[in-house]
Design a protein with these regions (language model features):
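Non-catalytic, surface-exposed connector residues within folded enzymatic/regulatory domains
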Residues: 21-25, 72, 93, 141
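Conserved AdoMet
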Residues: 32-105
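Residues that form generic nucleotide/phosphate-binding pockets
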Residues: 13, 17, 59-63, 187
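Non-catalytic accessory regions of SAM-dependent methyltransferases
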Residues: 1-47
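Conserved SAM/SAH cofactor-binding pocket of Class I
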Residues: 95-194
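Charged catalytic carboxylate motif
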Residues: 6, 26, 55, 95-98, ...
Length: 195
């Protein structure tokens, strides 16, 4: 298949499920990560052959079934870094990046800051704070083994030191004192609370 044919297939599936701007972003994310095909490559050499690294029809089906692109790609971008993701770990929201940027701006000159991230998920908050505030000691907790596995993987891949701990925060905080506690837990609707 050519680059253009692959792009058209992926974009067509995304366009059936998303608004045009979002469809392009979804197609670009999935093509680049899962197929190794950047949109600029499609523009520059649309007729160049492109070997497939994935089953294109299955990929198109996943996109068309409204599965989030970040789960299809297996990653998300957060504060300029690439974080592994999989189902069972929530996709960080743009406002979470704003929260992290605000913390970094306010505490950039603080030395030895002790930070606790509650409900770390993918580890994006904890790992980014460890990277941006290198003198900080960051602890991250989550109740989910899946989340902790992904968060540890992200910290290792991005070469950041974060202490991860499995903990239900409702049963008590981790040992130690903290200068800053940060959390951006998932939103729970009233109907979900009743379940």
């Amino acid at each position: 298949m050519t680059r253009r044919e692959i792009w058209d297939t992926v974009y067509g599936a995304a366009a059936a499920a998303y608004e045009p701007r979002e469809a392009r972003a979804v197609a670009a994310l999935v093509c680049e990560d899962r197929l190794g095909l950047r949109f600029t490559d499609v523009i520059v050499e649309p007729d160049a052959p492109c070997p497939l690294r994935d089953d294109l029809q299955r990929l198109a089906f996943e996109i068309g079934s409204y599965r989030p692109a970040q789960y299809i790609a297996g990653f998300c971008r957060f504060c300029g870094r690439k974080f592994s993701l999989e189902e069972g770990v929530l996709i960080p929201r743009p406002e979470t990046e704003e929260l992290v940027r605000t913390i970094v701006e306010r505490h950039r000159s603080d030395s030895g800051l002790r930070i606790l991230d509650i409900g770390t998920g993918s580890g994006c908050i904890a790992v980014t704070l460890a990277a941006e505030l290198p003198d900080a000691r960051v602890t991250a907790v989550d109740i989910s083994d899946t989340a902790l596995r992904i968060a540890r993987r992200n910290a290792e891949r991005l070469r950041q030191t974060v202490r991860f701990e499995r903990r239900d925060i409702l049963t008590g905080p981790p040992e130690g004192e903290f200068d800053l506690i940060v959390s951006n837990p998932p939103y729970v609707t009233e109907s979900e609370k009743r379940q």
